[in-house]
């Protein structure tokens, strides 16, 4: 009998968790509908994580999914690292206004563009040591992103503006004759 009560309690806890997770997914499932499952999944996931930490998460999306020049694996690495870095920077910040803004577009000039801006704690200049990726402890992730962008003949740039950090990347949309991307 004691074991049965314990199982019932555990099932109630699990049911509550699943109901909450299902409600979160349902609330956000139609919010992101670019036609690319990787983009939609990452944005939904990080939107929920940001909400859970009282971080504003906003996006402007104008993506033609057939024109994204990154495969799903590459796109996962790029979005995963950039969004994870943004979320981490906001989580460690004590300012009352914290946000992540994502702007993603496949442009008419045949470029896939991702701009991510997030708030962060300003770093005093005398505490910063010269490194390739200023103010970030995520050098390997950004190096993987840079490698993918370079392999696709794109550019990546970041700006530290004290209390905000901006990452801008642009990858040309170049199709080979058989329809696959370079």
Where are these regions (language model features)?
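Short beta-strand/loop element within the Bergerat-fold HATPase_c
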Residues: 97-109
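Short beta-to-alpha transition helix within the HATPase_c
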Residues: 19-23, 35-53
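Glycine-rich nucleotide-binding loop
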Residues: 122, 161-168
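Conserved short strand/loop->alpha-helix "switch" segment adjacent to the catalytic nucleotide/phosphoryl-transfer site
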Residues: 31, 57-78, 133
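ATP phosphate-binding glycine-rich loop and adjacent ATP-lid/helix-beta elements
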Residues: 128-156
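Conserved ATP-binding N-box helix of the HATPase_c
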Residues: 72-95
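Single conserved hydrophobic/aromatic residue that forms the stacking wall/gate
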Residues: 1-13
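Glycine-rich/acidic phosphate-handling loop/turn and adjacent ATP-lid/helix
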Residues: 111-139
């Amino acid at each position: 009998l004691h074991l049965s009560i314990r199982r019932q309690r555990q099932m109630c806890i699990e049911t509550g968790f699943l109901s909450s997770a299902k409600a979160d997914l349902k609330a956000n499932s139609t919010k992101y509908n670019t036609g690319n499952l990787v983009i939609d999944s990452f944005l939904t996931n990080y939107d929920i994580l940001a909400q859970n930490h009282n971080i504003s998460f906003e996006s402007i999306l104008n993506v033609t999914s057939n024109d994204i020049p990154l495969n799903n694996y590459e796109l996962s690495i790029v979005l995963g690292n950039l969004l994870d870095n943004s979320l981490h920077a906001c989580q460690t910040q004590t300012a009352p206004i914290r946000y992540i803004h994502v702007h993603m577009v496949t442009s008419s000039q045949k470029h896939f563009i991702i701009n991510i801006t997030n708030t962060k704690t300003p770093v005093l200049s005398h505490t910063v040591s010269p490194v390739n990726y200023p103010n970030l402890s995520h050098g390997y992730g950004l190096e993987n992103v840079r490698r993918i962008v370079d392999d696709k003949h794109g550019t990546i740039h970041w700006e530290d503006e004290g209390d905000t950090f901006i990452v801008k990347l642009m990858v040309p949309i170049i199709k080979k004759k058989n329809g696959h991307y370079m």
